[in-house]
Each structure stands twice: as C-alpha cells, then as structure tokens.
Curated annotation (Swiss-Prot):
GO cellular component: dendrite; early endosome; early endosome membrane; endoplasmic reticulum; endoplasmic reticulum membrane; endosome; glutamatergic synapse; Golgi cisterna membrane
A single GO molecular function term of this UniProt record: ionotropic glutamate receptor binding
Family: Belongs to the NSG family.
Compartmental location: Membrane; Golgi apparatus, trans-Golgi network membrane; Endosome membrane; Cell projection, Dendrite
Tissue and organ expression note: Widely expressed in brain and spinal cord. Expressed in neurons during maturation and synapse formation.
Role, per record: Plays a role in the recycling mechanism in neurons of multiple receptors, including AMPAR, APP and L1CAM and acts at the level of early endosomes to promote sorting of receptors toward a recycling pathway. Regulates sorting and recycling of GRIA2 through interaction with GRIP1 and then contributes to the regulation of synaptic transmission and plasticity by affecting the recycling and targeting of AMPA receptors to the synapse. Is required for faithful sorting of L1CAM to axons by facilitating trafficking from somatodendritic early endosome or the recycling endosome.
Protein name, per record: Neuronal vesicle trafficking-associated protein 1
The entry's keywords: Cell projection, Cytoplasmic vesicle, Endoplasmic reticulum, Endosome, Golgi apparatus, Lysosome, Membrane, Signal-anchor, Transmembrane, Transmembrane helix
Topology within the bilayer: Single-pass type II membrane protein
Subunit structure as annotated in this protein's UniProt entry: Forms a complex with GRIP1, GRIA2 and STX12; controls the intracellular fate of AMPAR and the endosomal sorting of the GRIA2 subunit toward recycling and membrane targeting. Interacts with GRIP1. Interacts with STX12. Interacts with APP; could regulate APP processing. Interacts with FAM171A1.
Ranges for region Required for GRIP1 interaction: 129-164
Residue numbers on the Lumenal membrane side: 104-185
Residue spans crossing the bilayer: 83-103
Name of encoding gene: Nsg1
C-alpha cells in the first residue's frame, strides 16, 4: 500500500522509513495537457501536382514513361460478386475435405464385430471365410462364380411334375395320330 501525502516537490528531503506497514512512494501530480501540445505552425505548405508540372514544361530531363500493361480480371466486377465467388470456392474446398474424410472413414477404418472377418471391404462371418477365399478377387472371376452358383442352385431345385402333363402328352399324341390318319385318308 502507498502512504498518501507525498509529492514530487518533496523530492530532495528524505524522510526516515516508518515501520507502520506503508511504503512512502511519492505520488505523481496530474499531467497538464498544455505541456503536450505544440503550438501550431504559422504557415503550412502543401505541394500539389500542379507545382511539379512546370518542371516538365521547362525541359528538364525526366526518365521516359514506360507503358504499363496490367490485366485485371476483377475490373468492372462488384464487390458482392467477388465475395460470392470467394465463398463458393471456400464451400467447394470444404466439401472436398468432408468427402475425403468420409471416404477415409468408410474405406480404411472399418472394424468388424466379434465373430466376423473383413474380406474385400465387407464383414463376413468367420464360418464363411473359407468360402470367400476360394473365390478370386478379379471381377470376371466373381461374375462367373456367381453364374455357376446360380446354375447349381437351379439344378438342385426339384421340379414338380404336374399330374396333368401325362394327360396332355397323351392328348397331343392322339391328336397327332388323328391328323396323320386324316391326311392319309
């Protein structure tokens, strides 16, 4: 804490330190604003372009002007359009990042539950693992394997024979016999 009552005016006189718990630090007097301001100049000289023009008329040597070639794709475009294009590019970039993250999650971070094994980016039961290892990984082989399984399944289906088939076949035979008899007669 600071003991009040000290000032810069008392700078030369040192008082003995009192052991009352206060430090005797001289307080600063308020700063006068008039001390900070400089008086305004009597005359202000502002040089304009017209003061430099007579130099050229007098024939003083100046470096030749070099034609500037600038291409501006934003010339004549409103600020609103510029901001819209910037936002569009930012959204496209963020969309690409999101798709990349989603792809990585589905492609590489696949964990199968207990009792399943990851084969060809699919979780299959451990009991069927030997069935899937017999198949080749190429697309043509997979296609032919599917067709062969379809043919085997089709052959294993028992065909139910209609009781009317024998009657219809006998009827067709009798019709053919009557037609043959009519043609011969």
């Amino acid at each position: 804490m600071v003991k009040l009552g000290n000032n810069f005016a008392e700078k030369g006189t040192k008082q003995p330190l009192l052991e009352d718990g206060f430090d005797t630090i001289p307080l600063m007097t308020p700063l006068d604003v008039n001390q900070l301001q400089f008086p305004p100049p009597d005359k202000v000289v502002v040089k304009t372009k017209t003061e430099y023009e007579p130099d050229r008329k007098k024939g003083k040597a100046r470096p030749p002007k070099i034609a500037e070639f600038t291409v501006s794709i934003t010339e004549g475009v409103t600020e609103r359009f510029k901001v819209s294009v910037l936002v569009l590019f930012a959204l496209a970039f963020l969309t690409c990042v999101v798709f990349l993250v989603v792809y990585k999650v589905y492609k590489y971070d696949r964990a199968c539950p207990d009792g399943f094994v990851l084969k060809n980016t699919q979780c299959i039961p451990e009991g069927l693992e030997s069935y899937y290892t017999e198949q080749d990984s190429s697309a043509r082989e997979k296609f032919y394997t599917v067709i062969n399984h379809y043919n085997l399944a089709k052959q294993s289906i028992t065909r139910s024979v209609s009781p009317w088939m024998s009657v219809l076949s006998e009827e067709k035979l009798s019709e053919q016999e009557t037609e043959a008899a009519e043609k011969s007669a």
